[in-house]
Each structure stands twice: as C-alpha cells, then as structure tokens.
C-alpha cells in the first residue's frame, strides 16, 4: 500500500459522518445547485486527518475496532497519511467547480489555523493554562472554564463551523449564521463527548445548558432542521 491507499482506506472506515452531513444540509437549505459531494468528502478528509494525528498525540492504539494508523503502519507513515488527507481535501475543494471556491479555500485555511492552535493549547494546557492534562479533571474557576471553551471552540467547533460554512458558501449564501450554528454545535458535541468519556459532569452542567440553548437558537436562525 502507498500513502494514498493507506489514507483513503482509513478515511473509509467507520464514523457518523456528521460534518459532511452538516455541509450538505447547509448547502441544500441555501438552495445550492450542483454537486456538493466533493466538498463533503473534503470535510471528511480533514476530520479523518485530525483523527490520525490525534491518535499519535494521545497514544491511542485502536479506533473503529481496528488498530490506529500509527499502530499499524508506524508514526512516520501515519503523519504522512494525515498530511495527505489534508492536502487531498484542499484539492477536492479547488476542483469542486463552485464560483465561491476562493472564499471556500480561505475559510478552510483560517479554520485549520484555529484548529491547530486549539489542539496546541490543549496539548500544552497543563503548563500554558495551568489546566490539568485532560479536561476530565476540569476545575470550576471561571478562567479555567473559559479556557476550556476556547479550546473546544477551536478544536471541535471549528470543524463543524467549517462544514456548515462551506455548504453555505458553495450555495452562494451568507455563511455567517451557518458558521455560528456549527461552532455552537461543535462545542456542545465536545462537552457531551467529554462527559461520556468520564469527565465530571457537575462543572460542565451550566456550560452544557448554555450551549444547548445557543445551538437551538442558531439552528432556528438557519432554519436548517434536523440533519
């Protein structure tokens, strides 16, 4: 297998494909015409690339019931496979044929910058923000909670925000409300994920309610419905 085959094989493994589905829902809600499939595939490539790199950083050995890419092929190959998926995602956007392609590329670039910064702050959190190494021991001070939200927005929120944003841009619509919805949904997704993974729900309860309200408000603003 070459890097392309390793990357695409992993990209085709499990997952709910929530981000591509959100991209498609935003595109359809905005009355888009044309084939959004390539852009949805790009969103999934970006997501799966982040999982490959996350598994290396976290030392996780299994995903989707199978060995992670680094465990199966080694760290250097896994890094290259993740990088290839990012590059392939950009190629898919450039080949999508939408008039807003330059704006879509710019949105993806800015989103990736924020995502990398959020991931970096999460990894450096213990020393940089005086946070514990994982959010599962999340303390309750306002400063630390605000830092947690900032990391969630950039790590997870950005991925959902970009998905909704690209769908709206491809349809020639105003992407701002869709970005707001995706960002709020992504933070709520991360909060729920952290609680499911064993975080103490008590310090997150109020934050969860806040983002449930934000998600509902922005979803209604977009009239995007259930996707």
Residue ranges and their predicted role:
Residues 1-227:
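All-alpha prenyltransferase/terpene-synthase fold signal
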């Amino acid at each position: 297998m070459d890097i392309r085959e390793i990357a695409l094989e992993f990209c085709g493994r499990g997952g709910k494909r929530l981000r591509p589905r959100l991209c498609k829902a935003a595109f359809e809600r905005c009355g888009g015409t044309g084939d959004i499939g390539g852009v949805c595939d790009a969103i999934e490539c970006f997501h799966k690339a982040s999982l490959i790199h996350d598994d290396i950083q976290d030392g996780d050995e299994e995903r989707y019931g199978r060995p992670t890419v680094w465990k199966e092929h080694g760290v250097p190959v896994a890094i290259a496979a993740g990088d290839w998926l990012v590059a392939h995602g950009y190629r898919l956007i450039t080949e999508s044929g939408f008039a807003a392609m330059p704006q879509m590329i710019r949105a993806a670039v800015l989103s990736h910058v924020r995502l990398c910064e959020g991931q970096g702050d999460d990894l450096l959190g213990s020393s940089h923000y005086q946070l514990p190494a994982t959010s599962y021991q999340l303390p309750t001070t306002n400063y630390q909670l605000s830092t947690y939200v900032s990391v969630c927005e950039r790590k997870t929120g950005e991925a959902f925000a970009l998905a909704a944003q690209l769908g709206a841009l491809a349809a020639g619509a105003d992407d701002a409300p869709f970005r707001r919805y995706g960002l709020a949904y992504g933070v709520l997704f991360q909060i729920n994920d952290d609680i499911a993974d064993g975080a103490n729900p008590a310090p997150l309860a109020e934050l969860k309610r806040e983002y449930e309200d934000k998600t509902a408000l922005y979803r209604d603003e977009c009239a995007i419905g259930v996707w």
